[in-house]
């Protein structure tokens, strides 16, 4: 049997832990009967993409990104529209694409997926000229991506510190969208996310219904919310119920043009970059080959009945509260109707 050629690209500074033990784990667990293996460490920003491009040009079968979402994006964008497949050993802070694909979060388990070697053709997106594989967007998540990049520290705690410090003082923007050629009304939004995969990372599901095989992007518009609603937004993100929120508008589309009032930050897979007032996002159907978990469908997590019930309950309360605030005369009637509906 002819061996497949596989290259591991290891980012030594991704995430928060040491990567010193990873080469020995790869050596120990990879099936040497199946693979002719090589390992490379990145030495500077953009190096992973250079190694991946050279590997692709050399006819390597699989290039494995060993790192976080930034490393995965660097490697993946070098492999789009080519026969070379992307593999992932997740070692970052969020690991959004790996989590969406239900890959194991430990090195040994991820290598076992590579040993099976099941490859699927998946979609990817492009925002302006930047390919992305999980999410892109603007508004608060792009603002926080910039803060996170400037912080110099990685990890979930750094991210949460920025979110909590900046979230309640952030000023929403107004966006006008053209979705597959059809214009929408203006939306005032806390953030506008366009998702190819379901989550940001850390199992925070910005687009619970997103699929990487449907040839569509999920557009998620989060309306401004106040401090009392913030815990519910967090709960919905973690419970895969954000699409049920009264503060969320969702669309599916192949091509999106976004107009905003002023230039500012956008992000692609968490990498921030400046952009103008018009932003273009499009899907590329089945444009990248990826090694996937053959057991993913059996493992896919769904919100349980209790989680869904709590989310619907709090969202209903938000609707009632809005009616009470905007129509004080109807206060008693609104609350009475809500209680009767729940008891019927």
Tell me what each language-model feature is.
Residues 19, 179-181, 211, 221-344:
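ATP/nucleoside-binding phosphotransfer catalytic cores, i.e., glycine-rich phosphate-binding loops
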């Amino acid at each position: 049997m002819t061996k497949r050629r596989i290259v591991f690209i290891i980012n030594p500074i991704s995430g928060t832990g040491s990567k010193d033990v990873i080469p020995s784990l790869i050596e120990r667990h990879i099936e040497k009967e199946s693979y002719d293996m090589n390992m490379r460490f990145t030495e500077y920003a953009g190096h992973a993409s250079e190694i991946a491009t050279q590997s692709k040009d050399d006819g390597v079968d699989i290039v494995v990104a060993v790192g976080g979402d930034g490393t995965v994006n660097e490697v993946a964008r070098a492999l789009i529209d080519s026969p070379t497949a992307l593999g992932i050993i997740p070692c970052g802070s969020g690991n959004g694409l790996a989590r969406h694909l239900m890959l194991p979060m430990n090195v040994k388990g991820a290598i076992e997926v590579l040993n099976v070697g099941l490859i699927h053709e998946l979609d990817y997106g492009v925002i302006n000229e930047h390919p992305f594989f999980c999410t892109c967007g603007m508004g608060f998540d792009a603002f926080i991506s910039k803060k996170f990049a400037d912080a110099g520290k990685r990890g979930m705690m750094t991210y949460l510190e920025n979110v909590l410090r900046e979230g309640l003082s952030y000023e929403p923007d107004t966006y006008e969208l053209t979705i597959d050629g059809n214009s929408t009304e203006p939306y005032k939004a806390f953030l506008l996310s366009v998702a190819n995969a379901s989550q940001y990372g850390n199992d925070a599901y910005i687009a619970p219904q997103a699929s990487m095989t449907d040839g569509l992007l999920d557009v998620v518009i989060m309306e401004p919310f106040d401090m009392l609603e913030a815990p519910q937004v967090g709960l919905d993100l973690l419970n895969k119920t954000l699409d049920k929120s009264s503060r969320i508008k969702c669309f599916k589309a192949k091509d999106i043009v976004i107009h905003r009032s002023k230039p500012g930050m956008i992000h692609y897979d968490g990498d921030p970059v400046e952009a103008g007032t018009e932003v273009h996002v499009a899907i590329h159907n089945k444009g990248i080959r990826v090694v996937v978990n053959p057991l993913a469908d059996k493992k896919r997590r769904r919100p349980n009945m209790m989680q869904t019930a709590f989310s619907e309950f709090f969202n209903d309360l938000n609707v009632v509260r809005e009616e009470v605030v905007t129509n004080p005369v109807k206060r008693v009637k609104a609350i009475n109707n809500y209680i009767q509906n729940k008891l019927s």
